[in-house]
Amino acid sequence: EKFGLHGQQLGEVAMGAVIKHSSDWNLGREAALSSGLSPLTPGITLQRACGTSLDTIVHIAGKIATGQIESGIGGGSDTTSDVPIVYGKGLRQRLLRAAAAKTTGQKLAAFKGFKFAELKPDFPGVAEPRTGKAMGQHCEDMAKEWNIARDSQDELAVASHHKLAAAYERGFFDDLVVSFRGVSRDNILRPDSSIEKLATLKPAFDKTSGKGT
């Protein structure tokens, strides 16, 4: 609505999310169809943990730079309010066997030996399956390898909060942020952050020798 794009056909919409439902297997296409853009606008879904939304921008910019498209939209979409919670592997296998069964007897046989413990759901995590580590833990490894001191990390964090607060105050984001359900700015911003306050925080990832909070 803001940019008058209703019904317009763009070169591409690229979207991504760290945690998404299986029904949103092509999130970019679904976002394009729900946005009011022309349904002829193609969509693609990318995923790279916390760098997903930045990668979608790079993807769109690269296509524009090489002349493949004239315009496009890139972004990310994540929420922990409606994450996909699934059944454990044991119950999933039973349900698949029951779905493939031809007779009532075969369907019932799929649940032979069923235990109520199988109803325990599997909650999604953000740790890599390969390493078992989340982004914060990898950051800890990097800080140790590169000898990045705790006070240097705190200084960067404080400067980040102060710069964002100043940008909001001077109106930098006025024409960049669209209010949604009454929210018009990041709700994790702490303008009163200080080195002294951050120094009191305990490590968030490596509880014994970590420096990241």
Language model features: what each stretch is:
Residues 14-72, 114-116, 130-134, 192-213:
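Conserved catalytic cysteine-centered active-site region
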Residues 22, 82-85, 165-170:
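Secretory-pathway/luminal and periplasmic proteins that interact with or process carbohydrate-rich
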Residues 7-16, 42-47, 72-76, 152-159, ...:
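Beta-strand segments within the central parallel beta-sheet cores of soluble alpha/beta enzyme folds
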Residues 1-2, 31, 95:
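Short catalytic helix/loop segments, enriched in acidic residues and glycine
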Residues 1-9, 142, 146-147:
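Phosphate/pyrophosphate-binding loops at sites that engage ATP/ADP/AMP, CoA/4′-phosphopantetheine
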Residues 115, 152-213:
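N-terminal extracellular/periplasmic Venus flytrap/periplasmic-binding protein-like
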Residues 70-141:
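Flexible glycine-/small-residue-enriched beta->alpha junction loops
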Residues 48-78, 143-172:
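Active-site-proximal alpha-helical scaffold in enzymes
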